[in-house]
Amino acid sequence: MRKLLFAAAILASVSARAQTASIPTNLNEATVVQLQSMMASGQLTSVRLTQYYIDRIIGLDQNGPGVNAVMELNPDALAIAKSLDMERAKGTVRGPMHGIPVLLKDNIDTGDKMQTSAGSFALVGTPAPRDSTVAANLRAAGAVILGKTNLSEWANFRSFESVSGWSGRGGQTNNPYGIDRNPCGSSSGSGAAASANFATVSFGSETDGSIVCPGNANGVVALKPTVGLTSRAGVVPISHTQDTVGPHARTVADAAVALSVAQSAKFDGRDPATGGVPLGWQGTGKTRPKVPSDYTQFLDPHGLQGKVLGITRQGLNGFDPFVPTPVPVMDAIEAAFQKLTDAGATLVDLDALGYNFAGGPGEFLVLVFEFRIDVAKYFATRPAGSVPVAQGTLQTAFDFNNAHADVEMPFFNQDLWAFTLSLAPGPDDPQPAFGGLTYNQALELDRQFAIQNVDAALTAQHLDAIVTATDNPAWSTDLVFGDHFIFGTSSIAAGEGYPIIQVPAGMVFGVPLGISFFGTAFSEPTLITLASGYEAATQVRANNLPTFAATVPFTNIQGTTVTPPHRRAAPPTVKPSRVPKHL
């Protein structure tokens, strides 16, 4: 299946070879500003740039080391690039993303010839009928949507034992810094593709960690926006309370450009969150501010000078006392923290002051309760008969997986979905699995967590942001026992819908380690300033590019590394009786 998906794009690229023989060789790691300068001066065209990325994907993703990050190439990408070049030749440049190729996670709808499947054959068939708002915003800004990236199937929300970066449709994505290592998830392909220079920027989605963890694992900048800053319309959901769409990029500047273009600065009627505030601000009297149109104005190479940051080390020693964080990793984290003070920031120890950053205690109930409802609403946007779960429910998808277990469940099951389907249906119904807690009570717990900890610390300690390590370095991919998380900190901002920016901060045994800056809702300008200051002071990414080689293990838990990467060649044959009817 994946070979066929690439065939059309490869054939199209061959016809353009004569025109692309003089592609510049200095495009690896090139930034948006550099590429625009080259196109403005005539040194480069969008067609040549698009061809460069296609060639790189063919050589390093589908062949060679086999990163396996790109699910599908857009067969119209070169034609779109040519049209944008013609616009430029006539004097029209839509903005900083004009002619710039981008990749989108395979849960973000594009109303073109590409599938939007969330990595599952249950959503393969007729492509989505229209663009997601994010895709539409990118197209309007002149971006070339180059293709779709692989992901942890259903955004890592199907099994308690899932493997990050694996989907039935896409197989296993691998880490450019170590092909034996995991790219984290669920925006696995997005993070790996940005790191491997398969596009200028890529976009993923996050509910809790799915943008920032791949950023950490793959050594790129990852920007998780405030919930409602980017529209979720046309994005396969988990939770309307927590879902958000954001960029992976190789520099903070490119992430800032990407956010400027992708955001919904005005209300999007397809997503009510774009007109309101996230959970953490609800009931506080705080209102949605006017958001900047250009986030690059907040870039500052001295952005840490004079700033006050609250630091927390909660959880960094590991979730499991029997699998502590290795000493070299902790040493690298402390070295990364030291760079903050070296660059002029003052650190306030929030742990000593008694704040709690374990995450909202009601989060999991909120996620499983909303998923069943929200995914059915998404299925309703797919016309009857267009894909196996069109007009269906979570039960429809559950049944599809059982009928096609050979391709959908060769390594792990759907116990998380079974648990979700067992919940009581009402928002005020007590949930026995959660000690009688109701959905509405869980929402309030998460809201209070934000007020009493994140926002309280920011205000009382006069902080510019909160900072900590993002996640443990990438582990060896293990399709038998699943992911080997030691720690992760994204829950600090997940339940309440607050933003995070993750930036590369160090290397451990050849794989990246990052730190994350957290703030209250709509604090992206401050976070971008801080991250750009850290990036300028450390240059971790610039001095440590991916090697596409195997690496040295950093824990004694390795499991099974799959080499070459597991892939699937063809979709299952769907029996007519399994195609959902219009409900």
Report the location of each language-model feature.
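Short helix-loop capping/hinge segments that flank enzyme active sites or metal/cofactor-binding pockets
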Residues: 98-118, 298, 303-317, 368-452, ...
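Gly/Ser-rich catalytic/binding loops embedded in alpha/beta enzyme cores
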Residues: 20-208, 226, 250-253, 262, ...
